[in-house]
UniProtKB/Swiss-Prot annotation:
This is Lysylphosphatidylglycerol biosynthesis bifunctional protein LysX. Keywords: Aminoacyl-tRNA synthetase, Antibiotic resistance, ATP-binding, Cell membrane, DNA-binding, Ligase, Lipid metabolism, Magnesium, Membrane, Metal-binding, Multifunctional enzyme, Nucleotide-binding, Transferase, Transmembrane, Transmembrane helix. It catalyses: tRNA(Lys) + L-lysine + ATP = L-lysyl-tRNA(Lys) + AMP + diphosphate; L-lysyl-tRNA(Lys) + a 1,2-diacyl-sn-glycero-3-phospho-(1'-sn-glycerol) = a 1,2-diacyl-sn-glycero-3-phospho-1'-(3'-O-L-lysyl)-sn-glycerol + tRNA(Lys). It comes from Rhodococcus opacus (strain B4). Residues 1-28 are annotated as: Disordered. The lineage of its organism: Bacteria, Bacillati, Actinomycetota, Actinomycetes, Mycobacteriales. GO terms for cellular component: cytosol; plasma membrane. The keyword Chaperone does not apply. The gene is lysX. Its cofactor is Mg(2+). Its EC number is 6.1.1.6, 2.3.2.3.
Length: 1114
């Protein structure tokens, strides 16, 4: 993935953190802690002064007296020496970075000057030398006392090579300088000209001018100093480059990284770029996580998230920070994801959003639609010119074709060197990168017009590494390659593609909008200006046209004061700023293993089967997922499972059907041969006899294994082989124990399923309600009450279906995925269909489709099915539930009232044999309640009036209703009409306190958008709600069949939805068009099946569902 990287703009606020604790080096407090910074500052200022007077004769003239005084007694200060200015600057930087070697150099240098001053003060009785000696004694004392503060080390480098470069450079500089002195000797005698050049170039002007008989022209001294500075700079760069190579990846390092990527590479799209070979790496002590980095300008720059187990990330980060502290580097991270940035932030780093990464979800990618018009037109235009696309894995590309692709990629590159660090691999055609994808645009004549190379992102993703196009290729080649990759991704198992990284995306996007503030527009203009060189805007534009998902990426750094240096170091690392290089190209380091010392813990090299060539650990040796931590009892059962396999016993055999259920076996006469199967719930071993309890869905039976019947070896095997919870199959005859208990006298048995987890307490079962929901299968296996509830539910649903079928109703199924949410006032769930690139809702009610069938002529129709409402979860609400809706032509809501009551009473008979329901009594036990006969019927306003003790009717003014609400502390919204306020009063005063099933009728018309108005009472609808024990069980309407009135009401609802009301219905034009074909007068009924089961069984909604929704484990 190619990307530009810079520090972020001012509108992106940093996340402040407490300073990160460094290793316990130095005092960390007191005045001595500041000595390195003060020493570095003083020498830094001095080096600038030396540089300035070396190039300025005017300044040199004005500072002549103090310069000579300092040069004589305190510190060398030659009149012109750029090389000495460079030396002092390097020493200042090293001191500020707390380098121990810089402390030694400065201390030894000051001691030598001190010795000189002492000798002069004694021999010449020079007061100035004596004063300088005292000052130097104080300075040396301070340095000695502050020695622990200079704790950072210098990386090992190619010292001899750097020394050779220095000697050669100085020799050349001296010879060239000698020639200059000969050309422009000034007053310098012939015999002193070579020594003058040698002193100025090589000896850093150590010899004073007074020791020579004359001097050359002034500009010659400046050039001679420049020659020395250039030689010294070349040596320093050689040393630094050697240090970088010395700490680059080794083969074992890369092998370990690839092993970690095999396990954890699916999370970070930049993970594979960690195998770039011109990076160094540091591992967590366990080897389970690692961080790759590069040091630029004293900044230890990590890239992306740590690689490996997220639980080991903090240890890897700590190791990385410790390493940086040892060498005095500032720490920074480029391109961290939100998860990685959180981990770095916890370690003390400050976080800034750097930009956004463009992610294409291939299953959602489609060229249709207005937003994709630009890409679609480009693709069509290029295809008309005969351009096709070829996609292959790198391992499938013949060597000669890969070599040609590499040649073209280099030829089409618009920069001298390959850019990229955190989001680029830096190599192409390596044998270890066989899983990478090569996408080529092939012109009609067979020539290659464009190339994309993408690296793996876990098993199902790829991340863009390289993008090239032929300068003369038609516009749209890149769009064709990207779209073809997305649309044919199924062939390669690809579901996501990471494209370019857009720095400052929010600035480009928001700064171009109408109404953007002046600061944002100015900032965008600045970025557009710099985009002429760094392609900041081009990267954003090239990505946004694909309508990607934008995923933020972050810059993490140690200290706000280091932000400028971090930004510059990032630009150097990414290739936007090129520093001078000598010798072999840096690109070579990214292709080959140039590291000499492996960073991976040595103990892991052999233990993990790492390969020195960088390939992933061998099959069977690669680190494997450890899985969940197993309790001891589970580990014991796993060991037993292994033991059974070693004995040739299949713990999960093929089926052999039992001859009887447990209940059938219990009811069989004594002596009957039976074979039963079930779960082993209890085992009691008495030596010569073993008793066990086996349960299937029908009931329990005692199994008796007698030593006299089966022998000693087999009875011991039974006791040793089985654990509680195992599924077993037992054959034998029905008989009795010595105490007369009915038992299955076992002759044969076998395991049909080994249970790896112990069952809960045999008496208490699962006592925690959340555990009962999460492990519903265990609860049903051991809890007979839970089983009875499911059996009752099955009986209720079957009764409802049979009752309606017996009345001539036809059962149908209507769509669950709907384009418009309607049929009820509720918040919907939203989903997306990739085939049509279309947002859909999970239905909140089947009503509108069932009414279409009524228009079609189905006079009696019903559906029992699942609906989904994005609402709260409590004892009577679940996000998905089962609903019954039935419609009968030439009927009304009063006839639906009779139908509803009879359906529930018949369902109660199916569950218990009588028209009764079970309700919790005062002590919590279930008691029977008779629900036979007629049920109470009240109007909604009548029920509210009874609760308030005042008259309330449909004509009651809104102000009076609001006053009553205030008086009884009932909340309402000021925008509600009288109907909405009255219904809110009903829900608070009536519904919550209703116990015996009661029908409440005549609800406000404004709250019933799909209901026919009451034929005689204005302001109310022909509707009722059935309520029992505070729960609404069902509702019924005289359906609204007037299409004009229905359109007006749904239009009002759609306006509420547009205003932000999530529960308001949307306008369903297809339904309205169907209604305009005429629908007969119809009565409609809706019942919550789950709530009917709750009513009949006395359980909560969770207890009546096989698998209620539960929060995920934290």
């Amino acid at each position: 993935m190619s990307a530009s990287t810079e520090t972020h703009h001012a509108s992106e606020a940093a996340v402040p953190t407490a300073p990160r604790p460094r290793p316990a080096l130095g005092s960390k407090s007191g005045r001595l802690h500041q000595v390195p910074h003060i020493a570095g500052l003083i020498l830094g200022v001095f080096s600038v002064l030396v540089f300035l007077w070396s190039i300025s004769p005017v300044l040199r003239y004005y500072v002549h007296v103090p310069r000579e005084y300092i040069d004589t007694y305190y510190f060398d200060a030659p009149d012109t020496s750029l090389s000495w200015a460079l030396v002092v600057a390097l020493l200042a930087a090293a001191l500020a970075s707390r380098k121990r070697i810089a402390w030694w150099l400065l201390t030894i240098y000051l001691v030598l000057i001190l010795i000189t001053n002492v000798i002069v003060s004694i021999t010449d009785r020079n007061v100035n030398a004596m004063v300088a000696a005292v000052v130097q004694v104080v300075l040396i004392g301070i340095l000695v006392a502050a020695r622990p503060e200079f704790y950072t080390r210098v990386r090992r480098g190619a010292g001899w090579k750097a020394l050779g470069v220095l000697i050669v450079g100085l020799a050349i500089g001296t010879l060239v300088g000698w020639g200059l002195v000969e050309l422009f000797p000034g007053t310098l005698p012939q015999g002193e000209r070579f020594l003058w050049a040698l002193n100025r170039v090589t000896a850093l002007a150590a010899a004073d001018n007074e020791q020579f008989s004359g001097r050359p022209h002034g500009f010659v001294n400046t050039l001679l100093g420049l020659f020395g500075a250039m030689a010294l700079l070349a040596a320093v760069i050689t040393l630094f480059r050697a240090q970088r190579s010395h700490n680059a990846l080794t083969g074992n390092d890369e092998s370990a990284l690839r092993g970690l990527l095999l396990q954890y590479g699916a999370d970070d799209s930049l993970g594979y770029f960690a195998t770039r070979r011109d990076k160094a790496v540091v591992f967590a002590p366990s080897g389970k996580a690692a961080i790759t980095y590069r040091v630029e300008l004293g900044v230890c720059l990590a890239s992306g998230d740590p690689i490996g187990d997220p639980e080991a990330w903090p240890h890897a980060i700590e190791a990385w920070q410790t390493l940086a502290s040892q060498y005095g580097w500032a720490t920074a991270v480029m391109g961290a994801s939100e998860t990685g940035a959180t981990a770095y932030n916890k370690a003390g780093l400050t976080v800034l959003q750097l930009g956004d990464e463009a992610i294409l979800r291939t299953r959602e990618f489609n060229l249709s639609g207005r937003d994709m018009r630009q890409v679609r037109q480009a693709v069509t235009r290029v295809r008309r010119q005969g351009v096709t696309v070829r996609i292959r894995r790198h391992r499938d590309v013949p060597p000669e074709e890969m070599a040609e692709a590499i040649r073209l990629a280099d030829a089409w590159r618009d920069t001298e060197t390959e850019r990229g660090f955190s989001m680029a691999l830096g190599r192409l055609g390596d044998r270890l990168d066989g899983d990478c994808l090569l996408v080529e645009a092939i012109a009609e004549d067979g020539e290659i017009d464009g190339i994309l190379s993408l690296v793996p992102w876990g098993p199902t993703g790829v991340s863009l590494d390289l993008m090239r196009r032929k300068p003369t290729s038609p516009n749209g080649v890149v769009e064709l390659m990207v779209s073809e990759l997305a649309t044919t991704s199924d062939q390669f198992g690809i579901t996501k593609v990471s494209l370019n990284f857009a720095v400052f995306r929010s600035v480009f996007e928001e700064g171009s909008r109408i109404g953007a503030g002046p600061i944002l527009r100015i900032w965008r203009s600045i970025l557009v200006f710099f985009s002429r060189w760094w392609q900041l805007e081009a990267l954003y534009r090239s990505n946004v046209k694909y309508q990607p998902e934008w995923v933020p990426r972050f810059l993490c750094f140690d200290d706000n004061r280091e932000l400028l240096r971090v930004g510059f170091a990032s630009a150097v690392a990414e290739g936007f700023v090129t520093l001078p290089r000598f010798g072999r190209s840096g690109t070579h380091d990214a292709i080959e293993h140039t590291g000499h010392h492996a960073a991976v813990p040595a103990a892991l090299v052999a233990a993990e089967g790492l390969h020195s060539d960088g390939s992933a650990p061998g099959e069977g040796l690669a680190p494997t997922a450890t899985g969940p931590k197993r309790p001891e009892q589970v580990r014991v059962r796993l060991d037993k499972l292994t033991g059974l396999a070693e004995q040739g016993i299949d713990p999960y055999p093929v089926a052999y059907p039992p001859s009887h259920t447990v209940t059938e076996a219990v009811e069989s006469p004594e002596g009957t041969t039976v074979r039963i199967a079930g779960r082993l719930l209890r085992i009691r071993d008495y030596g010569g006899v073993v008793f066990a309890v086996v349960r299937d869905w029908s009931g329990d039976i005692q199994v008796l294994v007698d030593e006299a019947r089966v022998g000693t070896d087999r009875i011991r095997a039974f006791a040793a082989e089985f654990d509680l919870g195992d599924l077993v199959e037992v054959a034998g005859v029905i008989g009795y124990s010595r105490r007369g208990a009915l038992s299955l006298l076992a002759n044969e048995w076998r395991m049909t399923g080994k249970c790896l987890h112990p069952l809960p307490d045999k008496w208490k079962g699962l006592s925690d309600p959340e555990t009962r929901v999460r492990q519903r299968y265990v609860d049903l296996a051991i809890n007979t009450d839970a089983r009875r509830l499911l059996e009752a539910r099955s009986a209720v649903v079957k009764s409802l279906r049979d009752s309606l079928g017996g009345r001539g109703f036809l059962e149908v199924e209507t769509p669950i995925l709907q384009q418009v949410h309607g049929g009820a006032n509720a918040a919907p769930f939203l989903t997306h269909i990739n085939a049509y690139n279309l947002d859909l809702y999970l239905r909140i009610a089947p009503e509108l489709y069932l009414k279409r069938l009524c228009v079609a002529g189905m006079e009696k129709v019903f559906e029992i099915g699942r609906v989904f409402r994005n609402e709260g979860v409590d004892f009577k609400h679940n996000p998905e539930f089962t609903i019954l809706e039935a419609y009968e032509a030439h009927s009304d809501y009063e006839k639906m009232m009779v139908l509803c009551r009879e359906l529930i009473q018949t369902a109660a008979v199916a569950a218990y044999g009588r028209e009764i329901i079970m309700r919790p009594g005062p002590d919590g036990t279930l008691v029977e309640v008779d629900i036979s006969g007629e049920w109470p019927v009240k109007t909604m306003h009548q029920a509210v009036a009874e609760k308030l003790g005042v008259d309330v009717s449909p004509e009651t003014p809104l102000a009076e209703l609001q006053r009553l609400c205030d008086e009884h502390e009932i909340p309402y919204q000021s925008t509600w009409d009288a109907g909405a306020v009255a219904q809110e009063m009903y829900e608070h005063l009536v519904e919550d306190y209703t116990e015996f099933p009661t029908f409440y009728t005549n609800f406000p018309t404004s709250m019933s958008p799909l209901t026919r108005p009451h034929p005689t009472i204005p302001g109310v609808a022909a509707k009722w709600d059935l309520v029992a024990w505070g729960v609404e069980l069902g509702t019924a309407y005289s359906e609204l069949t007037d299409p004009v009135d229905q359109r007006n009401r749904l239009t009002e609802q759609s306006m509420l939805a547009a205003g932000g009301d999530e529960e308001a219905m949307e306008l369903d034009e297809d339904f309205l068009q169907a209604l305009e074909h005429a629908m007969p007068p119809t009565g409609g009924l809706g019942m919550g099946v789950d709530r009917v089961v709750m009513l009949i069984t006395g359980g909560s909604i969770r207890e009546t569902l096989a698998f209620p929704l539960a929060k995920p484990r934290q």
